[in-house]
Amino acid sequence: MSAADIDETPQARELPRAYARRMAREKALALCEADAHEAYHILAGDTVVSCGKRVLPKAEDEATARECLALLSGRRHRVLSAIALRSPDGTLRERLAETVVRFKPLSAQEIDGYIAGGEWHGKAGGYAIQGSAEGLIAWISGSHSAVVGLPLFETRALLKAAGFPIS
């Protein structure tokens, strides 16, 4: 597994779906070029949390995580997980999974407790559903695996379309 070194700054007026797709695509292409893996299939992805038309950041500090959680408290938001598969012949296939998540109203103590656990670090929207944040979620509509970061249904379909022997 490799990390792509790309600029992940959203472009001016770029909508969340377009941003997620662009990130997955650019990561796949960057990994192919940087690591000279043209002869291999490259699967890349990105998970984006959006509130309205706003793309929330990946929380790199407590203040950002706290801001994201306060914004999401008691609200619905979308988690967009885009994947891109680049084949050795240069074909690029893409899929996007969209999941709606609603947090329960969060108290300051709940936010503080979640922040103290550190699961938020590097996570889109400042939370990781596969950890204790699951207890903060009132409901989810869509793909749980997409919120974790790899939409399994879409990944399977993408690999099958590329000719992988999947039954």
Regions found by a protein language model. Give the residues of each.
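Anionic-ligand binding patches
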Residues: 12-167
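A short beta-strand-loop structural module common to alpha/beta enzyme folds
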Residues: 1-9
